[in-house]
């Protein structure tokens, strides 16, 4: 008898599978625009100098490897909440908001999903179409009914009117996931006026906003990218925010994130945090300490924080210049207007508008690897190879 005889193989993650194919490709001029990590001009995902310095200090000063507790590192939680909500936020001053440390932004999303399923039974969750694919499977695994609202039109443009109409149809009291900035996978972000209109619908429909804040600093700046989060937290009595330190601190493998909860009052926040600690205990017990201590050290030291802010701005500006550079490289091929949206998008990703067939040709004929949806990781571009990439895109678009 085999207990596992009927256990079937499931398909691998398509993005990780793309990485495997890229690694096995022998062509010297191959280009990886699939996996969502920041790369510098040398094609490396660097450790930030601020992180290195913080780690050196921690090694010299740390005195224990004991557990950090269900809510994680308290200094990290407080400082990350300040980064997201603002140090002068009334929610923090009145103890109506706090953060629970999680293993990355993905852990924060799963904790939010379990919280909704456990504490708000019957509530569905609504995601943008398209969204990060893991949103779908993660919330389904938590037992939530997953539905979608429109976000991008058939001609690959942000469709705010369709989005608002979709939000109006969401059942009262359901949860709506919103991307704070640097929308993944499209790169299309809402304007301030758009956000105010979304807020109006969320408030009237009494929806619970869950704001995914994975890319703070990669859009228009650390403070600018927090605008929508702070708007919703300031205008609504209850908000959930998931935060990630993978991108803006470069702590991908250290798994550093948090679920920030904004409540009506301090007493209710205590109730909510007791539930989060209970749920976290059954997910990961306590989160890893090292990365959180690094972030807390950086945000708590003016010198390290200043260096980190410079490094984040350097990554942000490089991504923005690569976007503009690609559009300019496409101009001689008569494609600048067709791909003008690439320059206007924000963050690491771009919904290029390329079809799955064109993406396949880029991979097979030109060793350029994109996700089949046409999503490209702009942060994986090499400024020295923009002309080659533009020529490859022109060829697959011409036929």
UniProtKB/Swiss-Prot annotation:
<dbReference type="InterPro" id="IPR004839">
    <property type="entry name" value="Aminotransferase_I/II_large"/>
</dbReference>
<dbReference type="GO" id="GO:0005829">
    <property type="term" value="C:cytosol"/>
</dbReference>
<comment type="similarity">
    <text>Belongs to the class-I pyridoxal-phosphate-dependent aminotransferase family.</text>
</comment>
<feature type="binding site">
    <location>
        <position position="375"/>
    </location>
    <ligand>
        <name>substrate</name>
    </ligand>
</feature>
<dbReference type="GO" id="GO:0004838">
    <property type="term" value="F:L-tyrosine-2-oxoglutarate transaminase activity"/>
</dbReference>
<keyword id="KW-0028">Amino-acid biosynthesis</keyword>
<dbReference type="InterPro" id="IPR000796">
    <property type="entry name" value="Asp_trans"/>
</dbReference>
<keyword id="KW-0963">Cytoplasm</keyword>
<dbReference type="InterPro" id="IPR015424">
    <property type="entry name" value="PyrdxlP-dep_Trfase"/>
</dbReference>
<dbReference type="GO" id="GO:0030170">
    <property type="term" value="F:pyridoxal phosphate binding"/>
</dbReference>
<dbReference type="InterPro" id="IPR015422">
    <property type="entry name" value="PyrdxlP-dep_Trfase_small"/>
</dbReference>
<feature type="modified residue" description="N6-(pyridoxal phosphate)lysine">
    <location>
        <position position="247"/>
    </location>
</feature>
<keyword id="KW-0032">Aminotransferase</keyword>
<dbReference type="GO" id="GO:0033585">
    <property type="term" value="P:L-phenylalanine biosynthetic process from chorismate via phenylpyruvate"/>
</dbReference>
<feature type="binding site">
    <location>
        <position position="67"/>
    </location>
    <ligand>
        <name>substrate</name>
    </ligand>
</feature>
<dbReference type="InterPro" id="IPR015421">
    <property type="entry name" value="PyrdxlP-dep_Trfase_major"/>
</dbReference>
<feature type="binding site">
    <location>
        <position position="184"/>
    </location>
    <ligand>
        <name>substrate</name>
    </ligand>
</feature>
<keyword id="KW-0057">Aromatic amino acid biosynthesis</keyword>
<keyword id="KW-0808">Transferase</keyword>
<comment type="subunit">
    <text>Homodimer.</text>
</comment>
<feature type="binding site">
    <location>
        <position position="132"/>
    </location>
    <ligand>
        <name>substrate</name>
    </ligand>
</feature>
<dbReference type="GO" id="GO:0004069">
    <property type="term" value="F:L-aspartate:2-oxoglutarate aminotransferase activity"/>
</dbReference>
<dbReference type="GO" id="GO:0006572">
    <property type="term" value="P:tyrosine catabolic process"/>
</dbReference>
<dbReference type="InterPro" id="IPR004838">
    <property type="entry name" value="NHTrfase_class1_PyrdxlP-BS"/>
</dbReference>
<keyword id="KW-0663">Pyridoxal phosphate</keyword>
<dbReference type="Pfam" id="PF00155">
    <property type="entry name" value="Aminotran_1_2"/>
</dbReference>
<feature type="binding site">
    <location>
        <position position="36"/>
    </location>
    <ligand>
        <name>substrate</name>
    </ligand>
</feature>
<dbReference type="GO" id="GO:0042802">
    <property type="term" value="F:identical protein binding"/>
</dbReference>
<protein>
    <recommendedName>
        <fullName>Aromatic-amino-acid aminotransferase</fullName>
        <ecNumber>2.6.1.57</ecNumber>
    </recommendedName>
</protein>
């Amino acid at each position: 008898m085999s207990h596992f005889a009927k256990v079937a193989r499931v398909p691998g993650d398509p993005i990780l599978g793309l990485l495997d194919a890229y690694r096995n490709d022998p062509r010297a001029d191959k280009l990886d625009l699939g996996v969502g990590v920041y790369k510098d001009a040398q094609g490396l995902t660097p450790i930030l100098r601020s992180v290195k310095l913080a780690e050196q200090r921690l090694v010299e000063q740390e005195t224990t490897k004991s557990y950090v507790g269900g809510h994680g590192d308290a200094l990290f939680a407080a400082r990350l909440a300040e980064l997201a909500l603002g140090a002068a936020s009334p929610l923090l001053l009145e103890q109506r908001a706090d953060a629970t440390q999680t293993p990355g932004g993905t852990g924060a999303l799963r904790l939010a999903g379990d919280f909704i399923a456990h504490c708000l039974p019957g509530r569905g969750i609504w995601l943008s179409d398209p969204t990060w694919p893991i949103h779908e499977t993660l919330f389904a695994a938590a037992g939530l009914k997953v539905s979608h609202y429109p976000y991008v039109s058939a001609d690959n443009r942000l469709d705010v009117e369709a989005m608002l109409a979709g939000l109006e149809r969401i059942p009262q009291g359901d949860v709506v996931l919103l991307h704070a900035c640097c929308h993944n996978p499209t790169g299309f972000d809402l304007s301030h006026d758009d956000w105010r209109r979304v807020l109006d619908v969320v408030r009237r429909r009494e929806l619970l906003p869950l704001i995914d804040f994975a890319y703070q600093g990669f859009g228009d700046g650390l403070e600018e990218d927090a605008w929508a989060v702070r708007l919703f937290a300031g205008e609504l009595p209850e908000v959930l925010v998931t935060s990630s330190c993978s991108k803006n601190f470069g702590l991908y493998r250290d798994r550093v994130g948090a679920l920030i909860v904004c409540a009506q009052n301090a007493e209710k926040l205590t109730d909510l945090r007791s539930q989060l600690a209970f749920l976290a205990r059954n997910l990961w017990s306590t989160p890893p300490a090292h990365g959180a201590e690094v972030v807390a050290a950086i945000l708590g030291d003016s010198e390290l924080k200043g260096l980190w802010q410079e490094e984040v701005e350097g990554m942000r500006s490089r991504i923005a210049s690569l976007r503009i550079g690609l559009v300019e490289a496409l101009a001689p091929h008569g494609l600048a207007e067709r791909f003008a949206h690439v320059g206007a998008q924000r963050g690491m990703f771009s919904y290029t508008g390329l079809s799955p067939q064109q993406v396949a040709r880029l991979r097979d004929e030109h060793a350029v690897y994109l996700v089949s949806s046409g999503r490209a990781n702009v942060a994986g571009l090499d400024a020295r190879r923009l002309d080659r990439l533009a020529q490859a895109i022109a060829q697959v678009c011409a036929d």
